[in-house]
């Protein structure tokens, strides 16, 4: 039996999570497998996988998730599902950094709820690990009480977070008597799960299954043939939707939910071993996404959204009523009126959303405006602002730690509010701030904001085209923190985005930083396309989504390597910090 070393790593919010490290049997390993346990369990219950997988040349790692095993936190809870997904990213990066193993030489094995966390991470963060093995992912937990999910959601809205206990007995997880006995007697088993996490698990799983094509890593999916805990239909749908060029599905007849702890698990472990060894013997990168604006599923989606709906179709009539109400009663709302005038994707609208102060004609107008500002997309935008401020602070800390100056430049700043308000997070003020935008209106409003905040000696605002490679490359002073936020999401053409990024690659010195944003998913894409207008001559605001894998590849092509990422709770907006190579 391989012996584990016990360690901890720090999460983004400073929590120390427990993990086990099983070193390779002989010498220092250049390859690793990272294991993620089922819901309610902990890393100690994965020892048998480490031993029975029979891969002695691989270092192996497994954590105790927040609120599980020997990690801190309320049992079965986390601040949010997205926080736990971020924990996955931090753990994998910790393994790579602390143990000297390249991300490309790490494989990931995950079960049940752990497999949903890992699938969401693969979708939202586009990690460049070698492969994923997902066993019985809990994409759709069976709740046998009618309307249980809706009832839990209502109670959660009324009373806040609370806990429910798992109804699943060990005998429905596995046929293995020893695994049943150990489950029933293990004091570290967590029976409870918070309703916050349970509801978020459903939401994340539905999103990832619906948009599985964004996942392009090699994936092996193990499905238990007699699973009473989760609905396997969602697992089959996920597999069919995967964008991976290498994917393998194994259905194991008679297996209960604990696929890797079943009595006949040698079948599953053997297939896993073969898949993992094949993936590590190959090193074929996935097909490039640089031409995704010409072909691919997000291009097809964009084309569908740009097509007119049949005039009398129910969907078109609903959208027509929405447009009519916005252009009539909606004008009582200051935010809607501003969007109709300048475009709902304009810098002026963005600044209004950041300020988040409902305004309108009459109390009804204020009420409409509050509802408008509280729409999911705008809530996500405000979280993105906070993440931008965190990314700027993180870049500044790295620069200060190495004795380098902090010089900030944002090439499409809108009104520049998020950059100027990020100064409150910085321990030391930067040497300079340069804000640029193509719009005279934004330059004027941003300059006024600089004056309002009395930052004239530190910051200046100039007109500039973020897609002009030469203009961007000649930015002075040369930035050590370059920012491009909310711009590339509005333009589908990768050639234009690459020109902008190449300019930034020339402007930013090796070792300095770029902060860029993405929008890999949005639940309201069709509503936006059918009802809102853009800043471009009042055309319909039709967006082509870029998956996180696509925007990361564009950044790498321009010479940047992602170091860290922030994602909101809904998986809509991302902020990435990258270093110039």
Per-segment meaning from a language model:
Residues 250-303:
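Catalytic active-site module of serine/aspartate enzymes centered on a nucleophile-bearing elbow/loop
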Residues 215, 221-223, 227:
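Short beta-strand/loop motif that positions the catalytic acidic residue
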Residues 40-43, 69-104, 268:
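Catalytic nucleophile-loop/oxyanion-hole region of alpha/beta-hydrolase
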Residues 333-401:
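Class I SAM-dependent methyltransferase Rossmann-like catalytic core
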Residues 217, 231-240, 497:
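Short alpha-helix in the alpha/beta-hydrolase fold that links the catalytic acid
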Residues 375, 390-394, 417, 421, ...:
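Class I (Rossmann-like) S-adenosyl-L-methionine-dependent methyltransferase catalytic domain
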Residues 50-73:
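Conserved alpha/beta-hydrolase
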Residues 498-510:
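A short glycine-rich, Lys/Arg-flanked "PGG" loop and its adjoining helix->strand segment in the class I
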